[in-house]
Amino acid sequence: GSIAFKGDTLSKITPNIIAQMGISRTFQNLALFKRMSAIDNILVGRKLHSKANFMDVALQLPKARKEEKVNLKKCEEIVEFLEIEKIKDTPVGKLPYGLQKRVELGRALATEASLLLLDEPMAGMNVEEKREMCRFILEVNEEYGTTMVLIEHDMGVVMDISDRVVVLDYGKIIGDGPPEEVRANQNVIDAYLGVSHGE
């Protein structure tokens, strides 16, 4: 199959161009710089908006300093939004898993994407961490107006926070619609209750 965004097929487009199109993502397995602080990891997401070149930055020219101020201010707002002010200067490798996932969400938000792809954002989290991540996902949508596509196996979470649910079984769509409709779909029930594919 193929994936299209605003009429453009993405299969042959490089990741940097996809980011420029307004798509950002988080990963199932964390992809953070463990020795860098939380705020520095979030700042990485601002790279897309940087216009200063290497020499501007190296010589600390006014253009680079101004850009750095703007980027830092934006990241500080994200830190506050995600309620991670107390750990913003901590190397992410020293943070609990749930906070690392929040930092990764912050980095994705820093890109100012119109579409966020969240690959199993709740994987490995305890109940409280899941509850908090759900709250942040809903608030991102509300505050920033960002559309999110979530790949998640916790069906309770999916049903609670989604406007639309698409369920795949071995690559085939078996359910598509509002959560209430998908929850009652017999094909979805069979797939998640383990009915054999031979039946």
Annotated model-derived regions:
Residues 1-199:
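Glycine-rich phosphate-binding loops of nucleotide-dependent enzymes
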